[in-house]
Amino acid sequence: YNTYLDRADAAVRTHGDVSFSQGGSFYDALYGMETFGLVPEEEMRPGMMYADTLSNHTELSALTDAMVAAIAKGKLRKLQSDENNAMLWKKAVAAVHQIYLGVPPEKFTYKGKEYTPKSFFESTGLKASDYVSLTSYTHHPFYTQFPLEIQDNWRHGMSYNLPLDEFMEVFDNAINTGYTIAWGSDVSESGFTRDGVAVMPDDEKVQELSGSDMAHWLKLKPEEKKLNTKPQPQKWCTQAERQLAYDNYETTDDHGDRKSTR
């Protein structure tokens, strides 16, 4: 909720140069919990405002994308405010998000104890500084930090840049020693599945898909989807191949293949 409002504000202040859309980066979660706090899921349960079990932001985004674009990219010479100088567009965007997501509670009771979002976050013992974001690209020096240049990284969260082989060594070590990993990828990649497996099929070696253009997951036929959930030839990308895919737009926003460990 708060991240949506912050992103809308950034989009309007930059006249649309900052994108406003669904999604974001892992840094949004870290920034959000330290800045705004946390609440138990039952306080703002996904889908609770429209009797569903999971969040479905399609309709919400259709409304708010249009609202933010009308202000950020419109031809209005002056934006309206109320008697307290609060911008009316902000109040309107916040109201729509509250209708679809719920109103963030100022206080709530959890297991017999009263909390605010900030005090509940503090009670968890979580620290944003315990998490680190890693990436691997050659257009910045290795062993330095930089904000990955994708639209969803609009808060300019920093990532440590490692050579690809070291990047994977850290990944494997994190798993083997019990640390948590969040891997940034996207459901429109051909190797995405909802069965707990992600692969990068080798188009040339996967004979069962011979003649296919490896359409995005949502366009694959059921029999084609099954091919991504069983062992098959995979492509092991080199540093140069990874960089080229980023540079030529083959893998861009939402396809950052970034991970964070703690």
Predicted segments with their positions:
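Predominantly the structural core of cysteine protease catalytic domains
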Residues: 5-258
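Conserved small/polar residues in nucleotide/adenosyl-binding loops
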Residues: 261
